[in-house]
């Protein structure tokens, strides 16, 4: 889908100050390095300012301070990145869903599907499910018994919702995601693992986004819960009974063990792992590849990852780590010897 807007229209949509001709047509978005005369770009990160002078964009989203020295056209805003985020939806080429149920879809007789919803080819909607207004269900999706997909939801092709999953409004779920699969619950009886039925569900709030191939397991007894505004990247594992607070974001490959609770407005970088049955308070940032083994009770930034080094230096550091226990014991012995000598009373020059 091709979209064309004038600079004047974009300025009005953003409440921006326009520096340049209102009638100039903009047909898309691009980076400072790649933008052409009919495209809009933005400068948000200072490290990219070096590309601004030679930028060929039709216009650039800029802060007032950067616009003063820029010879080209500009839309002057307080926060260029937020402005870019808003404008991006106007130029999104994603095909629009068409209301109705595809002839190849299988919809249970007692399922409720709003007339404005779109059900794609070969989708399955099971008994008791409810699909609300303006929902788009992509091809080959499976919506299990008694599921609810809230108003304005968008399920990409091949999303799976097991039974008893409740999804809020305007939720986006990408392909391959599985919501409500059975949690990893087993009881060990004399070395034999006995399966525990996972009889809870999953409850997801409004404005949540879930990435490609991410799994959110159903609760063992009560629901696994994802709060409003949560953003989950690709290939994340959310185990049974986990609770995630509003507006928390997680990058790819995070793994959260069962019954862990994460607060609001937290950020977990890529590859973070959390053990089960711990609590993370609000406003916590955890850096990439960190292993969280205990509860975090104070807001702030946390890390356990080892920073990159040249290989030879890393090998030396790894060898020293193995020696730390022995070195600590030797240091304690030296401290005892020093204490013994000093406590015995040494002669002074004053005699």
Swiss-Prot record:
EC number of this enzyme: 2.3.1.191
Key words, A-Z: Acyltransferase, Lipid A biosynthesis, Lipid biosynthesis, Lipid metabolism, Repeat, Transferase
Catalytic site positions: 240
GO terms, molecular function: N-acyltransferase activity
Database matches in SUPFAM superfamilies: Trimeric LpxA-like enzymes
Gene Ontology cellular-component annotations: membrane
Domain of life: Bacteria
Enzyme class: transferase
Example GO biological process: lipid A biosynthetic process
Annotated pathway: Bacterial outer membrane biogenesis; LPS lipid A biosynthesis
Catalytic reaction equation(s): a UDP-3-O-[(3R)-3-hydroxyacyl]-alpha-D-glucosamine + a (3R)-hydroxyacyl-[ACP] = a UDP-2-N,3-O-bis[(3R)-3-hydroxyacyl]-alpha-D-glucosamine + holo-[ACP] + H(+)
Family indicated by similarity: Belongs to the transferase hexapeptide repeat family. LpxD subfamily.
Physiological role: Catalyzes the N-acylation of UDP-3-O-acylglucosamine using 3-hydroxyacyl-ACP as the acyl donor. Is involved in the biosynthesis of lipid A, a phosphorylated glycolipid that anchors the lipopolysaccharide to the outer membrane of the cell.
Subunit and partners: Homotrimer.
Protein name per its UniProtKB record: UDP-3-O-acylglucosamine N-acyltransferase
